[in-house]
Amino acid sequence: MDIFQAVPLHLQIPRIEIPKMASAASTPSTMSSSQTWSSSRPQVPISYQQLRKLSEWGIEALKDTSPTVVGQDRFESQEILIDNDYRTDFLNSHEEDSRWSKQVDLIMKQLPYGDLDAFVDEFHYEIISSQLLTSSIASHHQLFTVQKSILNFNKENTLSIHNAEGKTIPTKYGQLLISGKKFYLQRTIPYMFTILTARKAFRKMLYKRHLPRSSLMSLLMIAVYLALQQEYFHAKYSKYTALLNLRQMNAALQSVDKLIYRYHLTYKELTIYKPIALTENRGLRSDEARTLTLLTDVLTCTVDQLFHKLNIASSNILPVVNAVQLTDYISIYNVDLQSLYQMIRTVESLDITQKLERLQYMRKFFLCCLLSINYTDPLKKCEIALVLKRIFPGYHVEKTSDIERFQIISKQLYTLTQGISSLLPVLHHYKHLLLSVYGSTIEKEDPESKEAVITQSIYRLSELQRYLMKQDKTSTELSSHLIDELNGIIQIWNIDYKHNSHEQLKPPKCSPRPSSQRVFSGGLNLDIVKTTSDIPVVVDSFPKLTSLVDVLEVDETGSDIEKEHEELVYGTENDQETASSNDSKFSRFTDDQLRHELNQRILNLSIENKKSRENLRKQKSFELMNRKIENQKKGRPQIDCKGLFNSEESIPVLFELKQFLNRRSD
């Protein structure tokens, strides 16, 4: 709002001339500046008789040149608003006005609500870029970093305060009180009252002559500056708090969502395994049944509490939400209000899967409500308002200021974050249930395998402690059970150690060979020396072949010679016995062991095959080169006129010679 809009201006008001009529006996009446301005108020010197005659005009008296369109020749510009003396005072003070205008620009540099659009965009981006509106398992990549963020609030407004605890410090943002690690800031100048009072005073100053206005304008501008700064600080702090609480709520909600997802997977695995065990005429073991019961209780308690907390937060935020934008967002993210109404108002007992679906629906609706918060006032009369009134009986539209709106949002987000954080200790306390389903099986895909082993060991030790507390006598059965449990725990750590040592020697999953031996299809491999020197390092880490490998002869076209002569090959009895023994050996392997054995053999064969092909190519290149040299010595004509050593077979040899000469020159 421009509070200095009443600065004197030189206005242009046209002079009106009344044309002479045939029936009128008077002369044309004109309006001049000398007749229209007085010290009290302007007066128009037109008599009642002239006005009466003006009313007798008809349409036939008006012509195209009548003063009906602005800009015609009948209009003449003349300055009549301000008299000469008053205009002279302002012309003489032109330099002073320019000095005041610079001060006004500095005062208006930081307006309280100038960055509201940027805050709304950053608030929306913080919600959309999270994993909550899409898949909770998808990888999260930050699209871009906000350069001028609302969260840079502390950096811009740092205060160097030393030994000021318990004292009240006057600042331009208000009275500052420091108590421990908390800061209390109290507003000292009301915003709207100060702005309206200053505007009224500036307007009155325009009609006061010969009044020293410098001191009064300085006082008013200081008051306006302090009011703007305090409003700017409080508005930005409310936006800063809302965005900070939103970020904390996002982090807490994502952590809970990931843990609930893992609990649900374990629950589904047990519920799928249970009917299979019953079909085989054997029920679940006691530990598996106890784990399934605990998982059901933990999931039910956590999901129900989180759903009701989101429901309360949504109903409290709805009064400051723009209902039209909420309609757009729930259609984008496929949230059906009818289904939401049925999920909230249902009284039937739901299973775990249905409760999780209800929780995801409410979470999406809550985030859509946050996306619908902007700087416009919520609408009272719209179609969706009636539907929201049925879903949330306490729904009503409130007309609040921007600061109050951000404070409501910040308070609800903080309360929701505290409620979500109270669920995390429960989920972490029963995290060992996720690892007790398959006994000593360790999740290989878990990046925190060390933590998984520790958690599983603690769980088994706690179970062993609970078992020992129930025993009152020492017996052989108790000793054997204790030894078996301890051996099982030791076996877990041995499996983890072997798994880690195998991972160090295991090539990447994307290729059956190590990264140093990865072959890129870029043509003929030129660096023979460096390639062959790297092979023994890899070969030593794997068992070598005991039998020789027959290398097929390859012609110049690259096709195998033996492929053209296909014939049946019959195995001997010795081969059949070896195959049967291998079958019996492999039948005892698990799928992971078979896959590992197959990968090892493929890797060994590929290394040996590559080495033999490189030796064959090298030998062939030397033979071709020697043949050309012998033909040249005997004086035999060359078939082609090309130079020596320019064929593809001679490239590896030339590459080696070049490296050898470079080492000699160094």
From Swiss-Prot:
Q: Which GO terms describe its biological process?
A: peroxisome inheritance
The alphabetized UniProt keywords are: Glycoprotein, Membrane, Peroxisome, Receptor, Transmembrane, Transmembrane helix
Q: Where does the protein end up?
A: Peroxisome membrane
Which InterPro entries does UniProt cross-reference here?
INP2, Myosin-bd
Q: How does this protein lie in the membrane? A: Single-pass membrane protein
Name the principal localization, coarsely classed.
membrane
Record's protein name: Inheritance of peroxisomes protein 2
| Organism whose genome encodes this protein | Kluyveromyces lactis (strain ATCC 8585 / CBS 2359 / DSM 70799 / NBRC 1267 / NRRL Y-1140 / WM37) (Yeast)
- Gene that this sequence comes from: INP2
